[in-house]
C-alpha cells in the first residue's frame, strides 16, 4: 500500500478489524520509510449489475436511485434513516445474488414492493402508486383491498 505522504510502497499493518458489518476490513498501517500512520479499507469488489430498462436501454445499477425512491416512499413514516439504509442494502444484496450481471428494472421494482409490503404498508402504497402509475382512486382501493386480504390471510394462518 502506497504511503499518502512519501509515496513509499512498503508499510506494515499495525491493526486489522472488521468494518461495515463484516463487508470490509479496516487496516491501520505505518509507512516503513517515514513512519506516517494511515488507515486503509479493503472491500470485495462487486460485479457490476446492468439494469435493462423498459425501453430496451441499459444502465449500471445505481444504489443511490434505489435509496432516493425508497426514501421518498418512507417519508413521514416510522421508518428511520438507519432502517432505510439497511433496507436498501438488503435489496442491493438480493439484486447482486439473484442477477447474473443483468436484471430488468421491473424485477427490481417488484422486489422492492415485495419487501416494502412486509416492512411498512404506507411506504408500500406510496411506492406502488408511483411504480405502478396509479391513475385514480380505484387503483389505490384495489391495492388497499389486496393488502387487507393478505392481512386477513396472515391472521387466519396464525389462529
From Swiss-Prot:
UniProt entry tagged with the keyword Nucleotide-binding: yes
Keyword Membrane: no
InterPro entries reported for this sequence: ATP-cone_dom, NrdR-like_N, RNR_NrdR-like
Highest taxon, organism lineage: Bacteria
Essential cofactor(s): Zn(2+)
Zinc fingers, unnamed class: 3-34
Cofactor note: Binds 1 zinc ion.
Gene Ontology annotations of biological process type: negative regulation of DNA-templated transcription
Keyword terms, alphabetized: ATP-binding, DNA-binding, Metal-binding, Nucleotide-binding, Repressor, Transcription, Transcription regulation, Zinc, Zinc-finger
Transmembrane spans: none
Stretches the record annotates as Disordered: 1-21
Bias (Polar residues): 1-11
Signal peptide per UniProt: none
Stretches assigned to the ATP-cone domain: 49-139
One annotated GO molecular function: ATP binding
Function: Negatively regulates transcription of bacterial ribonucleotide reductase nrd genes and operons by binding to NrdR-boxes.
Family statement: Belongs to the NrdR family.
Protein name per UniProt: Transcriptional repressor NrdR
Organism the protein comes from: Prochlorococcus marinus (strain MIT 9215)
Lineage: Bacteria, Bacillati, Cyanobacteriota, Cyanophyceae, Synechococcales
